[in-house]
């Protein structure tokens, strides 16, 4: 197993380098440098590809299969084989084309979103869709799954569309009718802070450090779409500052949940499959735990509001945003009750994309139709509609279900951690820190 572990260490280190290049692309990369960056990431992908296509690694797999292994190594070997199958399933030339088109679309998405004009990205997105369909087809053949299920398996091996359908049937049957029947706030109060973004971030960093985010192994920056990336022991989270400071802080706590999870992976398995996240559903459960059950809790809000001199105005905005069902076209800003409906809509559209290979124009129409039927929202702005999320424009399909599954897991964690309620009843950072130890 030692030689196999060395191969996988190389694989994960190369992924780390790619992760840092991606972070730089999202935060600092000049517009005219996109082509060079896509070449850099494409070459890195080729090096990764060579690792798993070598005859030597196949021989090492066979040796390991004929060796008595520890329980940990047996599980690691199983995961290694799965990764190799998926990596080798995709043609290297297709991987390079995908990387280049993803970077192009990601930058065009920024422009299209800021100008509320999807025509800027429509052609390139349709080209990207063609490449993703080919990726899904190749992956499906290697994994004996449907094309869409093969993409879902990239993010969570424990779920496929049949299981996710059962999960979302509850949303269809129970949540959507109740949402449509509830009298909702249409325009919640928005708190306007007179504190600068940089000063708020400086004070919030103190709170995040108290929640175990290690700034000696991580950092916070700004980007067009909040995310958590970087590398092993170099976790980089981003946020964007909105007119509504609560939305910015909510996103920041969400990404901090991802970051704390990454920083607490077991050191002895950092460069093995066993030391990676269990799944993206579990990863999202950690981010949504931080967002929904810490930041959005009434008890922890008292800690946050100290920064704003215990503002009654901010408290009103907080209660209307996070403790009231309301009409909101934006997924990341949605209240906890309507949030899974937003995810459900994206899942429905993704299924249609891979069933009937619909293009951007039909995707946009389907998006608007579903928002009207399921959320009573008549969309006018494309920025608040099909352009609001970055995922599809980065070629990421099959990921959205992990948000709903993650929210479910986060709620289960909260339900099974009675100490957490006790500690939040006496809201101070030390008590919250203690409760996190028990999760």
Residue spans for each PLM region:
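Active-site recognition of the HExxH zinc-binding catalytic motif
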Residues: 249-264, 284-288
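Divalent metal-coordination and catalytic microenvironments
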Residues: 4, 140, 254, 287, ...
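Long, amphipathic alpha-helical stalk/connector segments used for oligomerization, subunit docking
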Residues: 299-394
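Post-HExxH zinc-binding segment in Zn-dependent metallohydrolases
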Residues: 276-314
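Conserved small/polar residues in nucleotide/adenosyl-binding loops
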Residues: 437-439
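A well-structured
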Residues: 1-157
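Contiguous, non-catalytic segments that form substrate-binding/exosite surfaces or channel walls
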Residues: 98-247
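C-terminal substrate/ligand-recognition segments
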Residues: 395-412
């Amino acid at each position: 197993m030692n030689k196999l572990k060395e191969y996988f260490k190389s694989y994960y280190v190369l992924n780390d380098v790619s992760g840092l290049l991606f972070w730089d692309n999202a935060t600092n990369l000049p517009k005219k440098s996109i082509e060079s960056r896509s070449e850099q990431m494409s070459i890195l992908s080729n090096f990764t590809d060579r690792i798993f296509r070598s005859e030597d690694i196949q021989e090492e797999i066979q040796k390991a299969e004929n060796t008595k292994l520890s329980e940990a190594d047996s599980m690691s070997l199983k995961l290694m084989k799965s990764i190799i199958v998926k990596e080798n399933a995709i043609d290297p030339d297709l991987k390079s084309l995908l990387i280049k088109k993803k970077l192009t679309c990601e930058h065009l998405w920024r422009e299209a979103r800021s100008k509320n004009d999807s025509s800027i990205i429509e052609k390139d997105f349709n080209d990207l869709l063609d490449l993703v369909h080919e990726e899904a087809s190749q992956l499906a053949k290697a994994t004996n799954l449907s094309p869409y299920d093969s993409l879902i398996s990239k993010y969570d091996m424990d779920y496929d569309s049949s299981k996710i359908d059962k999960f979302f049937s509850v949303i269809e049957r129970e949540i959507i009718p109740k949402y449509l029947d509830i009298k909702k706030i249409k325009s919640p109060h928005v708190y306007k802070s007179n504190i600068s973004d940089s000063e708020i971030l400086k004070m919030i960093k103190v709170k995040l450090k108290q929640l175990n985010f290690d700034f000696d192994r991580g950092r916070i920056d700004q980007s067009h779409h909040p995310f958590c990336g970087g590398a092993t022991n170099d976790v980089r989270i981003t946020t964007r500052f909105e007119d509504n400071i609560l939305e910015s802080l909510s996103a920041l706590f969400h990404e901090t949940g991802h970051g704390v999870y990454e920083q607490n992976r077991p050191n002895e398995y950092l460069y093995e499959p066993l030391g990676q996240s269990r799944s993206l559903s579990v990863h999202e459960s950690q981010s949504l735990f931080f967002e929904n059950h810490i930041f959005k809790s009434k008890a922890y809000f008292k800690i946050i509001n100290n920064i704003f001199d215990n503002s009654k105005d901010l408290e009103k905005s907080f209660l209307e945003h996070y403790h009231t069902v309301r009409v909101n076209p934006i997924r990341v800003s949605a209240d906890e009750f309507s949030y899974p409906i937003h995810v459900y809509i994206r899942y429905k559209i993704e299924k249609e994309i891979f069933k009937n290979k619909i293009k951007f124009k039909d995707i946009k129409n389907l998006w608007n139709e579903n928002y009207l039927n399921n959320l009573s929202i008549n969309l006018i702005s494309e920025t608040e509609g099909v352009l609001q999320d970055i995922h599809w424009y980065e070629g990421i399909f099959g990921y959205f279900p992990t948000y709903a599954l993650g929210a479910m897991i986060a709620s289960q964690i909260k339900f099974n951690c009675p100490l957490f309620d006790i500690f939040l009843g006496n809201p101070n950072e030390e008590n919250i820190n203690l409760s996190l130890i028990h999760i």
